[in-house]
């Protein structure tokens, strides 16, 4: 059960939904999630995205009017919400109910998909600070990457994701193998210079990338002000 929030006025919840996330499962959970917040004494206003960039725009235009901003969608939707927060300088707490296909962020933070648990944590937990990266003018929550398979998340058709879920990314990744090429990169990090031909590179703040690459938990902390850099060199031979 979810207790009521004690507040001089009903806590206003901005619920941002990506209806296509998770093969449409996020959309089908909307009513149950709204009822869970309302049963705790909250007033819920739902914003539904229709295209890329909507979530950031919603936050920048309306986020200041709410006590909590809750994202219901996948990693991409959460990234947009965080970008909107950073760009507008808001200090409104953000809650996340994972509803995507990969859910790397939720897995790294051990966030529950159970609605009652998720709503309770959003309303009553003390919350925590989290690092956000910035690349030129763009912000990212958990990874900024280049090279092999990085275009897959953008080019995988939504209809295919709706049908196959996470497997759609795998199929699209196989399709993209023929386009893989190395990038010559020079990187300075921690006063060290790394230069070479790389198939893949990522600046990340996560324990997993695309559910295919896992980082050791003892080296990763999402709130230490430090990002991890993952580089995969172009092999010199086929055996490598």
Question: What are these model-derived regions, one by one?
Answer:
Residues 190, 197-240:
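Internal anion-binding site segments
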Residues 54-57, 80-81, 104-105, 151:
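Phosphate- and divalent-cation-binding pockets in alpha/beta enzyme and binding domains
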Residues 1-72, 79:
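ATP/NTP phosphate-donor binding region
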